Amino acid sequence: MKPFVGDHTIETILVDYTPHLIKRIGLFLLVLAAAIMMLTGCGGGGSSSSGGKETSAKPTSQLEKISSYVKATNGFNGHNVRFAFSIDKVLAKMKAGEDLDFASFPAYNSLKENLTKAKTESSGFSDIDESTTAVLKVLDEMVPLTSKMESYYTSKEYTTDGNQKGREMVASYLKLYDQFNTEYSKLDSAISQHNSELRDLLIEEMKKDNKVMAATYMEISRDMRRALEAIDPEDPAKTDKAQIEKLLGQVKENMEKLKPAEDVSGVKSFKSSAERAIGRIRTYLAGGGGNDAFNDMVEAYNDFIRDSNRIDASELDNKKK
């Protein structure tokens, strides 16, 4: 993934960890979090995933188990998107062998703290647990190093030694950076995969339980994410625009169907941000790609997910009193 200079660009600077566009989408897209945790009474349904631990637990209980991991990576990815410009700029200079006079990094420290807390209980999936351990191992070296680098440049110590110490730390950082990107991409992918699988199971259970509005709400988020994941940021020309338009059409169709019997907080904002995300996706595809359009698209998507997470799905099927 693209050099991580910068979550979620996600790309160059925004969300991914590769020197070019590659699959930064995976690392910078926020994941739908726990609004579903509020849902109760869903039927049981087992889930089993390659690389993960088999489980017969209900989707809701499994989603609850991984929710702390989702929040940890969402926070990290979101920070990278917001501060992508400065993070990417610094990373580009390091990779070009230029001396730095300023340091800006992803939020490694908070990621370490949040993953350490999450790890106190198993996620329920072996691949998530193993990847978390691997990421934390790299962060044990990354966090103190970046702290020293920030202090070194903030204090302007680099002016007293001709940046010699700075070059040494940059070399160490770039090695750790590659290791981190490798391990974090595995973790991010595992969390996203299991989260998606569990939500598909939950959608089916909700339909069986006649929770039509809650299922529709989840389908909107699912299809929006699938539309973005179908985009090839390295070569936009290879993107199947027809497939993406089909998914976006399903999103718009379901937004028309999402009409709770009672006013539910956040639904209007959710629909507005969905429309904005659809517009940014279409703009990106129509323009043939480009970093600015890509970052705008991912930012709009992440805003959509934030609004999604503000909805209490358990209220969507309440009947008027």
Language-model features: where?
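N-terminal Sec/ER secretory leader and immediately downstream segment
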Residues: 59-166
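A cross-kingdom marker for long, charged
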Residues: 246-321
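C-terminal motif of bacterial Sec signal peptides marking the signal peptidase cleavage site
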Residues: 38-41
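Immediate post-signal-peptide N-terminus of mature secreted/exported proteins
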Residues: 48-102, 166-174, 178, 189, ...
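Bacterial N-terminal signal peptides that target proteins for export
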Residues: 17-29
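Extended amphipathic alpha-helical interaction segments
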Residues: 166-271
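Bacterial signal peptide processing site
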Residues: 43-45
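Secondary-structure edge/capping motif, primarily at the C-terminal ends of alpha-helices
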Residues: 80-97, 118-125, 146-160, 194, ...
